[in-house]
Swiss-Prot record:
Component of the integrator complex, a multiprotein complex that terminates RNA polymerase II (Pol II) transcription in the promoter-proximal region of genes. Keywords: Cell cycle, Cell division, Coiled coil, Cytoplasm, Developmental protein, Mitosis, Nucleus. Residues 650-695 are annotated as: Cleavage module binding motif (CMBM). InterPro entries: Cell_cycle_regulator_Mat89Bb. Residues 565-651 are annotated as: Disordered. It is found in: Nucleus; Cytoplasm. This is Integrator complex subunit 13. GO terms for cellular component: cytoplasm; INTAC complex; nucleus. It comes from Xenopus tropicalis. GO terms for biological process: cell division; flagellated sperm motility; regulation of fertilization; regulation of mitotic cell cycle; RNA polymerase II transcription initiation surveillance. Residues 565-625 have a biased composition (Basic and acidic residues). Its main location: nucleus. Signal peptide: none annotated. Residues 567-622 form a coiled coil.
């Protein structure tokens, strides 16, 4: 259905009965010449407006704001009701301007206070308003012509704003019942006519206005649905400026408007031409101009305030005089027509004239801290003033930033191609054939699309380095069908074949596409790679196992293939040993040389530690009174180590330095063994004194060698 909102048609019904000529009792100072008054002249008495004048001024202000911001497609029909109903204009676009309405109102004139009140009623105007809503506007006729046989798809909605002086709540209820009955009667007439349209929805706004100082006989009531066609609300408002404020609030609610107050506007004073003062001007515009402020919430922005006696908040922007080139301005993301709230005030007229002369005004956000942020600009185009929204953050024309930024830098390996395929599989489209749920009720296509999206995103890694199976072409047959709501027998067989192929790949020890980004070395070993792959595949299948029994069969097949027999584990161990040997063989000779030197230095360090322990133990034994004095001994050293050290042809290694230091320290600690000093070829003869004492010949004493 082509939607025409309730704001497309607005019918004003203003009471023109005699009681509307009563004074509103809100005085206005007529004589404002308080200075330089000649002596003896009596000032003019203050005046007060009638209820009729207050109602017309407030309704005209409503229409002015609407025409300023929405010059097209928002229409007003003005009706005056007394002894009958008189329509001041039509739905034609040519009649939609304030000049036509003001000229028609001038012809009608104020209500006659001497007229018979019994002959006057607001009901005449309400009935005429319902008839007017049934008439087709040019925009509705254009839409009906485009749709041809589907012309009934064009909606007809409208709003009736009635300003009157009601007697009581029961009188208001009678007016609502009259409107409700009239709508049903005219809908029956419109059903059989090609020139009328049935009313699908009508919003009735009843405004009871009364003089200032009197008690209201009518109570306020929020929106209430009286029927499937009529919604009504009641406002009880004092006349004068209170009525104007109420209509100002309603026009913002009815047309989704927002308020912006321009502060610190420099203006020359009339009395003092050389000085200037700062003024404020409040503007109304569409609320989309404040979308950027939602993004700025919590970033130091401090420009929202509530106006007195107003439901809506206003956003404060400061007049800005930047020292930057216009080329440095951000891109404009939107332009919205504006309308001053107090159009006749001197600051408003000065600002509008300044803009209509071709000038532009930059506006900045008042912030508690931080740098200046220019968020809006006022400028005129073709005699109309627009509020331009400037992008205060990243330009919408630039490439978006990286989704996340980790400790290693921006993430760049997103699965962009896979995500494009994912969007293609989950795009929304019209669904012609109706489907039914298990309980027999109709299945909503939107809910079905949400369920499919939920299934596809149960396990979907976003980064290439975080997944293994989605980088393997061999897993595609399983990953593409496991997300289905129900599997066929052929799907189950394809999934099982995929699992068997993976088992065969593991048996052949085929490499896997494991990402080594951000890791040092060669990455995980082959069996560890397959363990990661099987774990991820199990996570994917387990996320969808509750779908059906066939999903469970795929899961059972996967778990059965993961449990390996003992001979398979033994083969894996042999494979790991072979890989270790291959890695050692692949090491360069320089690396092996460094390892040997390191092992030798470790051996020397362990020898030194043992020496220290022996020395400490010897000191303890020596200090005890009962222990004999131990002989001085030299630690066991290899024979080849005792030889003279060859001079190195190059720089000495760490091992040579340690060996030289150890030999020097040992030579200083102990006296050399007498037998070693007198030995021949490092062999000493023992017990020589026994031969000399006994004089025995040919007796060979025991010999020992000590190294």
């Amino acid at each position: 259905m082509k939607t025409f909102s309730e704001s497309h048609k607005t019918v004003f019904v203003v009471d023109h009965c005699p009681y509307m000529s009563e004074s509103c009792r809100q005085h206005v100072e007529f004589d404002m010449l308080t200075k330089n008054r000649t002596q003896g002249i009596i000032p003019l008495a203050p005046i007060s407006k009638s209820l009729w004048t207050c109602a017309i001024e407030a309704s005209m202000e409503y229409c002015r704001i609407m025409y300023d911001i929405f010059p097209f497609r928002k229409l007003v029909n003005f009706i005056v009701s007394d002894s009958g109903s008189r329509t001041l204009n039509s739905w034609n676009q040519e009649d939609q301007n304030l000049q036509e309405l003001m000229a028609a109102l001038a012809v009608i004139g104020p209500p006659n206070p001497r007229a018979d009140p019994e002959c006057c009623s607001i009901l005449h105007g309400l009935v005429e308003a319902v008839e007017s809503l049934c008439k087709i506007t040019d925009y509705q006729h254009e839409s009906r012509t485009e749709l041809m046989e589907n012309a009934d798809r064009v909606a007809n909605r409208g709003r009736i704003i009635c300003i009157t002086n009601a007697k009581s709540d029961s009188h208001v209820q009678m007016l609502e019942d009259c409107v409700n009955e009239t709508i049903h009667e005219h809908n029956k007439l419109a059903a059989g006519s090609d020139h009328l349209m049935q009313i699908q929805k009508c919003h009735l706004v009843l405004i009871h206005t009364y003089p200032v100082g009197e008690d209201s006989l009518v109570s306020d009531r929020p929106k209430k649905e009286l029927s499937n066609v009529l919604i009504s609300e009641v406002h009880s408002v004092k006349a004068g400026r209170h009525l104007s404020t109420k209509l100002n609030q309603l026009v913002q609610l009815h047309f989704d408007l927002a308020s912006t107050t321009i502060t610190n506007i420099p203006m020359k004073e009339e009395q003092h031409a050389n000085t200037s003062a700062n003024y404020d001007v409040e503007l109304l515009h569409h609320k989309e101009a404040h979308v950027e402020f939602n993004k700025s919430a919590g970033e130091g922005y401090n420009g929202s305030s509530s106006r007195e006696n107003c439901l809506k908040e206003t956003v404060t922007l400061k007049w800005c005089t930047p020292r930057t080139n216009s080329v440095e301005l951000h891109y404009c993301t939107g332009a919205f027509r504006i309308s001053p709230v107090d159009v006749n005030s001197r600051p408003s007229s000065c600002l509008t004239n300044f803009l209509l002369n071709g000038r532009s005004v930059l506006l900045e956000q008042p912030r508690k801290s931080g740098s200046k942020v220019i968020s809006h600009m006022l400028s005129s185009h073709g005699g109309e003033i627009f509020l331009h929204v400037l992008s205060s953050s990243r330009s919408i024309l630039e490439d978006p930033p990286s989704i996340s930024e980790g400790c290693g830098g921006r993430v760049t390996d997103y699965r962009i191609t896979d995500f494009g395929e994912f969007m293609r599989e989950n795009r929304l489209m019209p669904f012609a054939e109706p489907r039914y749920c298990m309980d027999g009720g109709p299945e909503v296509p939107l809910e079905r699309a949400k369920e499919q999206l939920e299934r596809h995103t149960r396990y979907w890694p976003m980064i290439i380095s975080q997944t293994t199976i989605f980088n393997m072409q061999a897993v595609v047959p399983l990953a593409s069908v496991i997300v289905k709501e129900s599997l066929s027998e052929e799907d189950v067989l394809n999934c099982q074949k995929t699992i068997y192929n993976l088992v065969d790949m593991e048996r052949k020890n085929d490499p896997l596409p494991i990402s080594t980004a951000g890791t040092r070395g060669k990455g995980p070993k082959r069996d560890e790679q397959y363990r990661i792959m099987w774990n991820e595949l199990e996570t994917l299948v387990r996320a969808h196992v509750r779908g059906s029994d066939r999903h469970q069969r795929v899961m059972d097949c996967l778990m059965a293939c993961r449990s390996k027999p003992p001979e398979e584990e033994e083969r894996k161990k042999r494979g790991r040993k072979r890989e270790d040997k291959e890695e050692k063989a692949e090491k360069p000779p320089k690396e092996n040389e460094h390892e040997k030197k390191w092992q030798e230095s470790e051996r020397v360090k362990s020898v030194l530690d043992r020496e220290k322990e022996d020395l400490a133990e010897a000191e303890v034994i020596k200090d005890s009174p009962d222990s004999p004095e131990p002989p001085n001994k030299k630690p066991h050293i290899m024979v080849e180590d005792t030889g003279p050290a060859e001079k190195s042809k190059g720089p000495m290694s760490l091992l040579s330095l340690w060996s030289s230091r150890i030999n020097t320290a040992n030579s200083r600690k102990h006296q050399e063994f007498v037998g070693r000093l007198n030995s021949v070829n490092n062999k000493a003869e023992l017990y020589q004194h026994l031969k000399e004492e006994n004089g025995a010949e040919g007796v060979e004493n025991g010999k020992g060698s000590r190294q």
